Amino acid sequence: MFTMTTKAREVVRRVTSHPRIGATSGLRIASQGPGEDALGVRTATGPERGDEVVERDGARVFLDEPAVPRVRGRLLDAVTRNGRVHFVVRNRH
């Protein structure tokens, strides 16, 4: 199961709460392509076909199909570096 830290949930709720994005919005995590290690993150108005939806405490994350096995059993965290927030997928301890 993919989970989120409290800070990650707060940031996801904050970045997806803009009225123009809509009530069904969330953060979408997607594979960057075959053989790529990187995952892309962006706001989305809703899940795309085939996305797995993870929701906790009002924070919604949409995982594209290729990303699911790469994040299964892991933890989404939000860290601040140089005044900017970055999302990090890490192992659960």
Give residue spans per PLM region.
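Long, hydrophobic N-terminal alpha-helical segment
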Residues: 1-19
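Detector for the mature cores of small, proteolytically processed
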Residues: 37-93
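Short secondary-structure capping/turn segments at boundaries of alpha-helices and beta-strands
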Residues: 14-18, 27-28, 75
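Short, structured protein-protein interaction patches enriched in aromatics and acidic/basic residues
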Residues: 3, 21-47
